[in-house]
Amino acid sequence: MDARALRAALDFGLIETLAAAPAQAAGLDSLGIGPGDVNLCYAWAQNAEISNGQFLPLYFDSWDQVVQATTAFLDANGDPRSAEPSLRGQVALLASMFPTVQDRNWLRLFVQALGDESEHFYHQYWIAQQRARRPVAEAVDSLWQSLRPRFQRFLTNTHQLDGQIVLSLVLGGEGRTLNAAPDHNVMVVTLPASTAAVAEPIYVVAHELVQTIAATAINDNASPAEQRDGVAAGYAPTAAVRGGEMLIQRVAPELGDGFMRFYLSQAGVTPPASGVQAVFTSTFQLPTAIVADLARQINQALGGS
């Protein structure tokens, strides 16, 4: 990740709005959209393809580009061959995320809702917040630039060489990451309200950087029954937290205590005055084999044997 690419959230706050999609989908009265048209919240919760659409903005540079691509996609009825040649790649991307007629109808209504909210409230709010939190963003940038050399070997060995870190107003400990290519990664992390919490985005960066390692550790060590019953999938959030803590302890140990306290707070657990490691480990429990594999892979990525 290139420190120079650290930037504020995408235009119109689209990342924030998509991250809070279930809440946004609930309030569509101003559009004249009734419950008989489509249940946006239910579809978001039930359809994996739709929920993966939260990563859609990471492929674009602006809200206008998202609108252009979705309009072309809907006009083509989801068929890339029916779109203009210059937009076929974008239409194909959308078709992979929203393959059915019902999915396309959901997308049409949702983009309409986002545009309406942006026009009536969110864009001006977003502009004001970017102005108010500029000192925080600058402090985060400075901290990341100072720490990035310590992460460099891990970034290189995990094929996350370059990309952008995007600061978001609404995301907490769970970031959003697109690993399109070794030199094209987009990571969305929290934007704190004050410089007192300047390290929080770095905690989330570490959490996001270990996602692939965490998935490998789970896949290699979960039993067939755990894979079949969905238990293995449930390990993923915890494995990312545990792996992020391991990475932080190796490359920036001075941030280790803060990392654990941050993620305990995110989990609704009040961090103790002392003994935070024990509480952290008991809160984010994993099978021993997965923990050991996480440690092994992180050590290897940092150049260990």
What are these regions (language model features)?
Residues 1-121:
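N-terminal low-structure segments adjacent to metalloprotease catalytic domains
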Residues 256-305:
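Pan-zinc metallopeptidase signature
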Residues 122-183, 254:
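Auxiliary, metal-adjacent structural segments of Zn-dependent hydrolase domains
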Residues 138-145, 200, 234, 238:
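Soluble non-cytosolic domains of exported or imported proteins
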Residues 199-224, 238-246:
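Active-site recognition of the HExxH zinc-binding catalytic motif
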Residues 227-270:
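Extended, compositionally biased non-globular segments
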Residues 92, 174-209:
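Active-site scaffold of zinc-dependent metalloenzymes
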